[in-house]
Amino acid sequence: MANILRKTKLYFKTPDTKLSYNISSIMQGVLMDKVSYGFGEKMHQNGIKPYSQYFSYEDDVPVWTINTLNEEAESELVQPLLDEGCQKIYLRQKNLTLEILKKEHQEVSYDALMQDTFFSSCSRYITLKFKTPTSFKTNNQYQFYPTTEHILKSLVNKFNACGFDAELDYFEDMEEALQHMQIVNYSLHSTQFYLEHTKIPSFMGRITLKIAGPQQFVNLMHLLIHIGEYAGIGIKTAMGMGAVEITERKEK
């Protein structure tokens, strides 16, 4: 069966209470309330989850985005939300009901992504917008600014967790791969993501990566980063962190 990446957006009527991206952890609870026991048990285990989700605003309209990386996650998490009978979302912890104005659903196959990136001729520059607080964890310490090493390792781990029928031979020597990557521009600020009673130090903003090396490596990085739009980058992407949007620019 072909791997399909899916993105679902629920647009809500603006509530009287102003909401922020921190509501994402509560939205995660909404998702898990609907799943089967077996799937729920798997999701409570450590490891990369086959989905990401986050809360944001588009033109002042509240939007909940859920990305799924395999068929099981799509069936368990998203299909109940796409049902015609699902017109509202109730947030028990907030005693708040969000009225759904519209739903959008799009999908792309791994094969199509490969054609658009790996078998294409991509730019050596790519800009990432970190839409929600992003952080990494190394040696039990939070890393709340981006480095090429943390970004690349996160993308490779999430790619491998997707179960794609492919091997990333380029990354057998991570140090060599990192020599081809450089952050050449950034506009970032530090922030915190509130998760229950914990404040996770994190960052938001934009960076521009310059990718050197063979064109095939450039294309492969574009493939990984495009998958990052669905999988997220960094830690706790199933809880609302690490949402990424991509803006490419032509090589100068």
Q: What role is predicted for each listed range?
A:
Residues 1-252:
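RNA-interacting cores
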